[in-house]
From Swiss-Prot:
It comes from the Bacteria. This is Probable transaldolase. It comes from Chlorobium phaeovibrioides (strain DSM 265 / 1930). GO terms for molecular function: aldehyde-lyase activity; transaldolase activity. Belongs to the transaldolase family. Type 3B subfamily. Signal peptide: none annotated. PROSITE patterns: TRANSALDOLASE_1. GO terms for cellular component: cytoplasm. One of its GO terms (biological process) is carbohydrate metabolic process. Gene3D superfamilies: Aldolase class I. Keywords: Cytoplasm, Pentose shunt, Schiff base, Transferase. Its main location: cytoplasm. The active site is at 91 (schiff-base intermediate with substrate). It holds the Pfam family TAL_FSA.
């Protein structure tokens, strides 16, 4: 399974890359907003420059999301995003207009990521429209007392049944168990916030065991 980081923060991307586990990056407008220091002066050029900076850090797909709602505007924006770097993947929302944009962009050879997917039927439509990636949001489903990982399992099974080529990105990851379940189910990718990446390596028995080892190591004299 591939690991993407779900952030627009360059420092977090660098830190994840240093672990040797980073295969790509996903961003969205909310993540971009978090890194903007002065919203009154953040232009589209600044946004494109920031995506380019991310692409320079990572040798893998970098998802950048359109901010339009109608098909024509999504296509225009998607083409501009794709021109930033060969690694850019254009994220489009799973709406009727978004599906039309995905179809158009995919036929033009532009990689696409169908985002805000919350049902198997949406995932089927994304695959049939030619999406390169499909992003089910597991945490947001868990938030409304629905089993987000069950959705991932359904999508993986359906895609396997019919040989759909879209890669499944488990998104809206809230804790390490989401990552483990994604791997168990057979999802292609988990896109993970840096806070969760940091927790993947942590276990209390590792900490207590290390403490005991260090205490016992005191018998070894210089």
């Amino acid at each position: 399974m591939k690991f993407f980081i779900d952030t627009a923060d360059l420092d977090e991307i660098r830190s994840a890359a240093e672990l040797g586990m980073l295969d790509g990056v996903t961003t969205n407008p909310s993540l971009i907003a978090k890194i903007v220091k002065d919203p009154s002066n953040f232009t589209r050029t600044d946004f494109f420059d920031h995506i380019a900076a991310i692409c320079d850090l990572v040798d893998g797909p970098v998802s950048a999301e359109v901010t339009s709602l109608d098909t024509a505007s999504m296509i225009k924006e998607g083409e501009a995003l794709a021109a930033i770097h060969d690694n850019v993947v254009v994220k489009c929302p799973l709406t009727i207009d978004g599906l039309k944009a995905i179809r158009h962009l995919s036929e033009a050879g532009i990689a696409t990521n169908a985002t805000l997917v919350f049902s198997p039927s949406q995932a089927i439509l994304a695959a049939k429209a030619g999406a390169s990636f499909v992003s089910p949001f597991v945490g947001r489903l868990d938030d409304i007392s629905t089993d987000g990982m069950a959705l991932v399992e359904d999508i993986v099974d359906i895609y396997d049944n019919y040989g759909y080529m879209a890669e499944v990105i488990v998104a809206s990851v809230r804790h390490p168990q989401h990552v483990v379940e994604a791997a168990r189910i057979g999802a292609d990718i988990a896109t993970i916030p840096f806070s969760v990446i940091s927790r993947l390596a942590v276990h209390p028995l590792t900490e207590s065991g290390l403490k005991k080892f260090m205490e016992d190591a005191s018998v070894i004299k210089p």
